[in-house]
Each structure stands twice: as C-alpha cells, then as structure tokens.
C-alpha cells in the first residue's frame, strides 16, 4: 500500500540505515501498552488514592511516586510490588515486537521494565546481551546478536528501578555510564523512537547534551506518533488546544533533529515496520535449484549461466542464500566469490549464506526445517532447473517444489525461470496461469518480463538481464 510521501521517504531512508547497520530502536511505554500492560498512570492509581490524590489530575507522575515514598518514610516496597505484579504477567508479543526483533538491528534502548524485547529476540533465536546495571556494561555476552539497554531497570529487580524523583535526580551520577553510552549511540546511529512520549527527564537531558555538543551537525533520528483526535463530547476549543500543543511538541523535537512521522492510527506502525522488513528482505535472494542435466543447455553453458547470474546479483547489491543444490550450488559460490574477491576486494559473510542439507535419514527429517530457516531470511526466491537422479532415472526434484511452496507461504516473491526447464518450468506455468494471485497489481512491464523468463531462445546474457530487471523491480 502506497503511503504519503513523508512516510515513503522515511521508509526508504530508515531501510538504508538498517541495511548499513547504522540503525537503533528506542522503545517507550506505548510499545508495551499495546500487549495489554496498563499505562503508568493506571499503575499508580492506587498509590495516588492512598495519599489522597487523583491520578487523573496529575501530570507529573514521577513526583507522585516520590510523594508516596515521602508519606511512607522513604519506603517504596508497595510500588516495587506493583511493578513486579504488572510486568511479570505473561502476555503475547505484538507483531511490532516480532518485526523489530527480526530486523538486522543490533542496538535496542528502552525505559520499559518488562522483558518483551528480550523475549522477541529469543524467539528469533537471537542472543540478547541485556544491560540494566552499570557493572553489566563492562561485560560482553559471547556471540551476542543484539544489545538491549534497559536504562530504567528490569522488572525482576524493582527496588533498583528508576522510578521516583530521587532516582532521576541521582541518575546523572549513579548511571553516568548509561548517559555516555546513549549519547554515543545518538551520535553514531539513527534511532527510531516507537511508543515514546519524550517526557522522560533523563532522555531530555541526554538529548540536550548531544545537541549542545553538535549543534547543527546532529544526526537525523525519527519518531512515530499518532495525530490528535477529537474525544467524545470534547469541546472544540479543548481539541484545538491539544492539536496546537502537539504541533509545538513536534517543532521542539526538530531542535534535536528528530523527524516526526505523524500517523492516523497506531495500526500504521505495523504497516510501516512491515514495509521496512520487506524492503530489507527483498535485497536477499534465495537461489533454489538442483540439476544432473540442464535441459536444452550444454553443461558448460548452464554452469556459465548460474555463475554469471550469481555474480550479477552480488554486483547489483543483492545478498544470496543457497542450499548448495547439486549441479547448481558450486557455481553459485564461484560466481559470488569471483565478484566479491576479484572485483570488490573483500569477502563479507552476509553476502552469501550457505546451508548445505544434512545427509542420512535423520537429515531428511530436518530438511523442511532447514528450508524454512533459509527462506525466512529472504524476500525473493529464484528457481532454476529442478531435477535429480532417482533409481537411475532423471526425475523432477520435489525439494525445489517444496521450496516454492514455503517461499509463497512466507510471502516471498517467487521467480521461477521456466527457460531452465523441469520443475522450474512447471512452477513458471503455475505462476503464469495465476499471475494476479502471485503478483497482485503488477503492471504490463512486469507481466512482460515474467513471460520472458520462459523464453528458451534468449541468450545467457539476455536471460540474466531479464531476471535482474525483474528482481530489481521487486526490491524497489
């Protein structure tokens, strides 16, 4: 779905930052509230009642928590228990949490006490190095995939959580290493603030420090907020006041070079994150295929075709995932390595991911899992040839068919190159007959290019150019 130009530009720019590993996420309370956790105001409602205040009339909840402690001789035990009870509840992750965990982002900051970010990363089989004490900053978890900085503490240690006014006043001394770490990330990374209200005194202090140091050279950051809507029975004047206040708030964020993306509803956050994820995934191609013979192709020409196709995909900045299919995989490797080593002068492990299939009976039982693991990393699946030897006869490879089914199930764009024959031709016929199902809304150019993928009269160069042009349209 096409969004307004400001959102489209943000998606394009932030996708680039994620792919270049310059992106970071700052998650606020709004992200956690979407799973069913109550707001901070609702959490403190019984505390306010106990000291004779109405939480609905209080804007400064940090001071409210401090008042409660003052009235109880500095004892915050009940508040600690409320935090533990609320944020220890088992809840389901939202799609936003899942997408944020799937993205190739390695830095997450949050003021939330809950463990939703860690849980989301764990479900993606990523190792999270969680930090919520000063001492933890000095250690590094082995083979970590992401660092989660919980600058206000963790639910399992509520007595240490940053909560009352005293905590905020002492933060710059007690938690100074966190201030320095966040300041450094704000300088070197592009942040996306999600579910954040920017009322936190600590973040305001850190942003001000960065602004003072860099003035007009601050790095661009982004935040997603929902535009104000008129409440039932709200006076027009009150609504206009809130709208004006939001306009001034957005203008103030620009002092810190934070670009605000205003949304009509919170569902748009999921749509935007899905677009970013899809943009990233379509830059990684799954090459599916196996062959003991190559249809009308001479073996030498087929090997050259696979070699050159892989090389050209890398040259066009696509990454490749392959299962090392017989008669295909080795030529994929050669093409990729030639482009990376000979022409680009470097070999990056992310550019080619190989997942050779396990052998033996036990391995066969794991093949579906292996296929899903490979394909989930990609956004486009290209299918070549697809044959094997079975009982001395050349037969169509069911494994390539399985990879097609999984690819479509996981919303990958499927690109069967029918001109290579065998299963690939069967798959091309299937997609061609139901083109609108596989490519809804595709224009005449895409339809024409797809038709050319079945043209056996094309030269190797012409067929490769057609594949590349088709895949580039998908990635854009």
From Swiss-Prot:
What keywords are annotated for this sequence in UniProt?
Answer: Antiviral defense, Cytoplasm, Hydrolase, NAD, Nucleotide-binding
Its EC number is 3.2.2.5
**Region SLOG (STALD) domain, binds 3'cADPR: start and end of each range?**
284-476
PROSITE patterns annotated for this entry?
SIRTUIN
The record's top EC class is: hydrolase
- Give the reaction(s) catalysed: NAD(+) + H2O = ADP-D-ribose + nicotinamide + H(+)
The chain positions of domain Deacetylase sirtuin-type read 4-283
A Gene Ontology term for the protein's cellular component: cytoplasm
Q: Where does 3'cADPR bind?
A: 289-290, 326, 357, 371, 388, 399, 403
Signal peptide positions (record): none
Q: Where is the active site?
A: 152
Q: Does the keyword NAD apply?
A: yes
An example of a Gene Ontology BP annotation on this entry? defense response to virus
Q: What happens when the gene is disrupted?
A: When this gene is missing the Thoeris system does not confer phage resistance in B.subtilis.
SUPFAM superfamilies given for it? DHS-like NAD/FAD-binding domain
Which CDD domains does this chain map to? SIR2-like
Q: Which residues bind NAD(+)?
A: 23, 114, 152
Sequence similarity: Belongs to the soluble Thoeris ThsA family.
> What is the role of the protein in this entry?
NAD(+) hydrolyzing component (NADase) of the Thoeris antiviral defense system, composed of ThsA and ThsB. Activated by a signal molecule generated by endogenous ThsB (AC J8G8J6) or ThsB' (AC J8CSK2, probably 3'cADPR), by TIR1 and TIR2 from B.dafuensis or by BdTIR from B.distachyon (AC I1GTC2, probably 2'cADPR). Upon activation binds and hydrolyzes NAD(+), leading to cell death and inhibition of phage replication. Not seen to bind DNA. Activation is 50-100x more sensitive to 3' cyclic ADP-D-ribose (3'cADPR) than 2'cADPR.
> What is the protein's given name?
NAD(+) hydrolase ThsA
Provide the species name.
Bacillus cereus (strain MSX-D12)
- Name the gene for this chain: thsA
